[in-house]
Amino acid sequence: IFFFFFIVNGLSKGFAMTGYRLGYIAAHPTIAKACEKIQGQFTSGANSVTQRAAIVALTSDMKPTFEMTKEFERRRKRVMELIAEIPGWKCSQPEGAFYVFPQVDSYFGKSDGSQTIENADDLCMYLLNSAHVSTVTGRAFGSPDCIRLSFANSLEKIEIAYSRIKGVLEKLK
């Protein structure tokens, strides 16, 4: 069974090192060699700063990483509770990343009197301009009825952001 078992991870997700585009695989040598051939066609190598960061991440005490993972679990739980309080938003619980991806199409066609929300792009701009909360349209991810929000921030700031979001969404009729 070892031949069919492998682990794929990366610094961005495994160690919350956003921007460090370096991944790794633990697999049977035959599988690893095949992956190496494919990967070699996509990039010529990671820069030296990323390589050094990987060494530090992979050889340091893992306790802070485990604590960080628990903190992200707390944030995810709270974000899911906050999303459940927003009428019309539907969201599956994320399992790996520190983003949520709620479906927000129940707000399409609604207006605050000066602006009508036609799509997720409009809603993202509305949230940015009215609630001062940055989101990303789901269109970029093939889900035009969704938006993406990060929970890679303190619980205090997350609470403030969702309070603002809820407040401005209540103005849409």
Regions found by a protein language model. Name each.
Residues 1-173:
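PLP-dependent class I/II
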